[in-house]
Amino acid sequence: MDDSSSEARAGIENDTTVRSRSPSVDSQSYAIPMPEEIEEQLSEESSSFDDSNSVESNEDQILGRALPESGQHAFSQDSQEFEPMLDVSKHIFDSLMQAIDSADFSEAISLQTKTSAVINSKSTELKQLIDETKVRFSQFKERFEKGSLTAKNIRGNLRYSKDKIEKINALVRTSYPIEFNEAREKILERPLDDH
């Protein structure tokens, strides 16, 4: 079993020496270039991170001066130079505090909730107005169609009445010319009311 496993290892080693460890495709040719705005944000964040690191190193220096020499070497097994240990919880806490300021975050959520409520109420109100407008438009359209039909009927009745009056005038003028002229003079002499 040892011989077969050593042969298999030798075969694998030979196989890996033949293959190239570099990728067959250059991934940089498919990379999407980073916009300048994002690069600026990243550089600003890294500068603010450097500032916070300098504050932490200042704190470490103050702590180093405050602790006696024996206290600094208490945790190291060797008598070599003391290396400051990383406080993970403090680092995570500081990172979270920098990333999310709780007051600003709650204000943003509150503002977003209020804005969402206003948008929802206005969209509901707009939908109601659209529905009311559709109903009113159909009512006005129906009234207009009825009004145009009534106007056509009235126009036809006026034409019919005008024709009848002209026929009656012609008949009265020929049958009773004296009375017709007297009545006509009375009508023309009658004063017209301005109101």
UniProtKB/Swiss-Prot annotation:
InterPro entries: BLOC-1_subunit_KXD1, KxDL_dom. GO terms for biological process: endosome organization; regulation of protein localization. Keywords: Endosome, Transport. Component of the biogenesis of lysosome-related organelles complex-1 (BLOC-1) involved in endosomal cargo sorting. Residues 19-30 have a biased composition (Polar residues). The gene is KXD1. This is Biogenesis of lysosome-related organelles complex 1 subunit KXD1. Component of the biogenesis of lysosome-related organelles complex-1 (BLOC-1). It comes from the Eukaryota. Belongs to the KXD1 family. Residues 44-56 have a biased composition (Low complexity). It is found in: Endosome. Residues 1-80 are annotated as: Disordered. One of its GO terms (cellular component) is endosome. The lineage of its organism: Eukaryota, Fungi, Dikarya, Ascomycota, Saccharomycotina.
